[in-house]
């Protein structure tokens, strides 16, 4: 498939998921993983587990930097605002979760850029902008604020947004009727109705990479 997309000039995004099972599960599974979620936050609490994760990233980054089978965009884990349901590391305060998540993202960015200076990393999130989209979930806008804070204090790097812009009510596809999706930055949800909110967010200088480049 990747050979065909490369021939046709199609840009490909890969989603980095860490299942807690398998031979590598013992090393890669976060020690506070709840045992229920389909994916785990990678374990970066020991040197051995961190090296294992870095080795996996290095293998993927080198392999898929080949122009004939290139992955240009790396989406780091799935809907991380729903860490309790998807990329799990136990029940953690948002600051603790985001500190760990950003380390995973930064590691992927640094390793991928050894092989492809034009590769990009993305934070994956659902439609809950100023509201938790599920029980025990985080608010996306709060998570992005932490991304900015950590990037500013630890050194900025270019990360981007990968939004799953579902309808406000998942069972109702009539997204144009979403009353909880407004054009305000304080909207509860970002859906197909109000994607302009994301453009507003990335256009603010305080949210740009080094204050100048849209994420």
What are these model-predicted stretches?
Residues 1-132, 168:
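Substrate-binding cleft and catalytic face of glycoside hydrolase catalytic domains
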Residues 96-215:
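Noncatalytic carbohydrate-binding groove/subsite architecture in carbohydrate-active enzymes
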């Amino acid at each position: 498939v990747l050979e065909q997309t490369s021939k046709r000039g199609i840009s490909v995004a890969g989603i980095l998921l860490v299942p807690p099972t398998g031979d590598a599960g013992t090393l890669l599974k976060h020690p506070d993983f709840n045992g229920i979620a389909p994916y785990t936050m990678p374990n970066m609490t020991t040197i051995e587990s961190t090296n294992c994760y870095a080795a996996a990233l290095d293998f993927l980054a080198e392999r898929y930097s080949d122009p004939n089978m290139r992955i240009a965009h790396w989406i780091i884990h799935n809907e991380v605002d729903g860490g309790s349901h998807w990329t799990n590391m136990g029940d953690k305060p948002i600051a603790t979760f985001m500190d760990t998540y950003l380390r995973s993202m930064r590691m992927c960015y640094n390793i991928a850029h050894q092989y492809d200076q034009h590769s990009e990393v993305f934070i994956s999130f659902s439609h809950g902008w100023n509201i938790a989209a599920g029980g025990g979930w985080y608010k996306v806008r709060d998570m992005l604020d932490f991304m900015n804070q950590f990037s500013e204090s630890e050194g900025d790097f270019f990360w981007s947004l990968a939004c799953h812009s579902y309808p406000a009510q998942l069972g109702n596809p009539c997204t144009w009727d979403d009353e909880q999706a407004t054009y305000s930055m304080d909207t509860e949800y970002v859906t197909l109705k109000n994607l302009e909110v994301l453009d507003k967010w990335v256009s603010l200088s305080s949210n740009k990479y080094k204050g100048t480049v849209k994420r």
